[in-house]
Curated annotation (Swiss-Prot):
Gene Ontology molecular-function annotations: DNA nuclease activity; metal ion binding
Cofactors, names only: a divalent metal cation
Protein name: Uncharacterized metal-dependent hydrolase MG009
Sites where the protein binds a divalent metal cation 2: 96, 132, 156
Lineage summary: Bacteria, Bacillati, Mycoplasmatota, Mycoplasmoidales, Mycoplasmoidaceae
Enzyme class: hydrolase
Cofactor stoichiometry and binding remark: Binds 2 divalent metal cations per subunit.
Source taxon at top rank: Bacteria
Keyword Cytoplasm: no
Listed NCBIfam families: YchF/TatD family DNA exonuclease (TIGR00010)
């Protein structure tokens, strides 16, 4: 493994229809990835893909915070647990789950309920927490401080400023194992706040991701994103951290192996 995409959606269109094309590129650049669920249906697809390509893909299963009002809580909890029990060896994380206050705060209590349910599943089964946090970093800091997870926590699509980075880094003082997954946003010219934050985040806490098919990095902005475009994220992170690209690749792969590919 030379590259790792910690968070992609090969289980979603338009990637799913052209997955063989992407898998060929996985092999070409020696890439592995997490295929991330956002609801029960595409979590099941993520598992099927991980079973079909076990040397390249792991599945993460969960309910996105923006979808919590669309599903039945008890039924979803039961089905998530069943999906996990029947496919444990192919699943790396619970998620993406978390809090999203960007569009509305109407479903805060429901997001809390689904967070606690998925948090418990991850902790009980010793799985990584793949967190989606948008406009809710004070909330996640408070809840992680209170719950003190024993399993690693990934801040998916971390694109915040240095102040939020410092606050989240302080969770290390509570012996919480945290990682910052950096998306293609880092390649954007207007991402200076993220660049400054990256400078203070230790490399041993970094992962790379695409969140494909969204958040396409430069030089492909405006087009569909693919997991193989993670190479552009890694090279940009290396430049910002003033580390050779080969060394940055080695560090990120080491972090990924620690979490997912033992």
């Amino acid at each position: 493994m030379e590259y790792f995409d910690a968070h992609c959606h090969l289980n979603c269109e338009p990637l799913l229809s052209e997955i063989e094309k992407s898998i060929a590129n996985f092999k070409l650049i020696n890439l592995k990835a997490n295929v991330v669920g956002t609801d029960l249906d595409n979590s099941k697809i993520a598992v099927e893909l991980a079973k079909k390509y076990p040397d390249l893909l792991k599945a993460t299963i969960g309910i996105h915070p923006n979808d919590v009002h669309l599903v039945d809580f008890k039924k979803t909890k039961k089905q998530l647990n069943e999906l996990l029990i029947n496919n444990r060896n192919f699943i790396s994380c619970i998620g993406e789950y978390g809090f999203d206050y960007h569009y509305t705060t109407e479903f805060i209590e429901l997001q809390n309920k689904f967070f606690e349910m998925q948090f418990e599943i991850a902790e009980t089964n010793k799985l990584v927490h793949m967190l989606h946090i948008r406009d809710a970093h004070e909330k996640i800091y408070e809840i992680l401080t209170r719950l003190k997870p024993t399993q690693p926590v990934i801040f998916h699509c971390f694109s915040q400023d240095i102040n939020i980075a410092k606050k989240l880094l302080s969770l290390k003082d509570l012996n919480i194992d945290i990682f910052f997954s950096i998306p293609g946003i880092v390649t954007f010219k207007n991402a200076q706040a993220l660049h400054e934050a990256l400078k203070i985040i230790p490399s041993e806490l970094l992962l790379s991701e695409t969140d494909s098919p969204w958040l396409t990095p430069s030089p492909f902005r405006g087009k569909v994103n693919w997991p193989e475009y993670v190479v552009h994220t890694v090279s940009t992170v290396a430049e910002i951290k003033k580390i050779e690209i080969a060394e940055m690749k080695r560090i990120i792969v080491k972090n990924a192996k620690k979490l997912f590919w033992h």
